[in-house]
């Protein structure tokens, strides 16, 4: 079960600003960077409480950080988790609502 005592702003880190995520907005789908330890239920509750919208579904994907060469050998970017949130109705203005 989801931890209800988590702050929603600790679950949702930032909206993803990319060409692909903008294309999904027309379908009512919004993409967010989320805490890698959070589950779909926590993400749904966080989106509903922050933006005051009704969520239909949440799809998540884990992205592995790339390995990069540095002056000191190999380094690795951190792993990230993204959530694609589909709304039942309404929309989110991601440029003014977050902050």
Swiss-Prot record:
GO biological process, one term: translation
One GO location term (cellular component): ribosome
Keywords from the UniProt entry: Ribonucleoprotein, Ribosomal protein, RNA-binding, rRNA-binding
Record-linked Pfam families: Ribosomal_L23
InterPro entries xref list: Nucleotide-bd_a/b_plait_sf, Ribosomal_uL23-like, Ribosomal_uL23/eL15/eS24_sf, Ribosomal_uL23_CS
Signal peptide (residue range): none
GO MF annotation list: rRNA binding; structural constituent of ribosome
Protein family membership: Belongs to the universal ribosomal protein uL23 family.
Subunit structure: Part of the 50S ribosomal subunit. Contacts protein L29, and trigger factor when it is bound to the ribosome.
PANTHER family hit by this protein: 60S RIBOSOMAL PROTEIN L23A
Reported function: One of the early assembly proteins it binds 23S rRNA. One of the proteins that surrounds the polypeptide exit tunnel on the outside of the ribosome. Forms the main docking site for trigger factor binding to the ribosome.
The protein, known as: Large ribosomal subunit protein uL23
Organism field: Leifsonia xyli subsp. xyli (strain CTCB07)
Lineage, top ranks: Bacteria, Bacillati, Actinomycetota, Actinomycetes, Micrococcales
């Amino acid at each position: 079960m989801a931890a209800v005592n988590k702050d929603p702003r600790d679950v949702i880190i930032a909206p993803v600003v990319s060409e692909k995520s903008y294309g999904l907005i027309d379908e009512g789908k919004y993409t967010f960077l989320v805490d890698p330890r959070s589950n779909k239920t926590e993400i749904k509750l966080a989106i509903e409480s922050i933006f005051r919208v009704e969520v239909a579904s949440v799809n998540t994907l884990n992205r592995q950080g790339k390995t990069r060469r540095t002056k000191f050998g190999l380094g690795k970017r951190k792993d990230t988790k993204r959530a694609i949130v589909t709304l039942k109705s309404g929309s989110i203005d991601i440029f003014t609502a977050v902050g």
